A protein has these predicted regions:
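Primary recognition of RNase H-like, Mg2+-dependent phosphodiesterase/nuclease domains
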Residues: 1-222
Length: 222
């Protein structure tokens, strides 16, 4: 409609009046735009829910293991890290390691394996394991085979079976910030595994944040 009006208005200008009716011209353009916009598919607005998330202390007598893998690209220079805390939120042990060049899922599994080995060496019998990698949590909670991740996946499952009481839980990344910081620390060095006797500086403030049960908000699609 708008193009037709412009064409006829041009012809009128050239062959008849020689003047431009700018007011009608502009109204027609506006009407054409409105008419066109009616036909466009409307984007449904996704409602967001605000939830409060934070690291939770395990029940009395239990220990919590948080692990994470870090690979900025897929694949890329990667690292893994994790830490153990008791029912009071007291730091027990933590580790970081370089993994060379690998993808994010394998980095997550390497970090989990190292965390489970550390928990086993320390003799913990009741363990809650938290990761922010949902795909790894699903793998650990069933027996689905994945040839691309063998034998690392089998190692993790076998180590998990040696712990009498355990739970593997998915958490949001905001809950897993200590492990994330350790994984990034590990990615800065190649093939070095370090167990810390004291928390490194980059996690001290996060440990305090978690211990006093501070939460932050996260937006979720409803």
């Amino acid at each position: 409609m708008g193009l037709w009006f412009l064409w006829t208005h041009r012809n009128t200008f050239l062959f008849r009046s020689g003047s431009v009716d700018t007011q009608n011209w502009w109204k027609c353009i506006q009407g054409s735009v409105e008419f066109y916009s009616i036909g466009l598919p409307s984007k449904a607005k996704q409602l967001k829910n605000v939830v409060s998330v934070g690291w939770e202390k395990p029940p009395r007598g239990w220990v919590k293991l948080n692990t994470d893998g870090s690979a900025m690209k897929n694949p890329d220079r990667a690292g893994g890290g994790g830490l153990l805390r008791d029912h009071d939120g007291v730091w027990l042990k933590e580790f970081a390691r370089g993994l060379g060049f690998t993808n994010s899922i394998l980095a997550e599994l390497w970090a989990l394996r190292n965390g489970l080995l550390l928990a086993k060496e320390l003799g913990f019998q009741q363990l809650i394991i938290e990761l922010d990698a949902l795909s790894v949590v699903i793998l650990m909670n069933n027996e689905t085979e994945n040839l691309l991740m063998e034998p690392l996946l089998t190692d993790c499952r076998n180590l998990l079976k040696e712990i009498p009481n355990k739970r593997v839980i998915h958490v949001f990344r905001e809950v897993n910030q200590c492990a994330d910081a350790l994984a990034k620390l590990g990615s800065q060095s190649l093939y070095i595994f370090a167990v810390f006797c004291n928390p490194p500086p980059m996690v001290k403030s996060i440990l305090t944040f978690d211990k006093v049960n501070m939460h932050c908000n996260r937006l979720l699609n409803s």
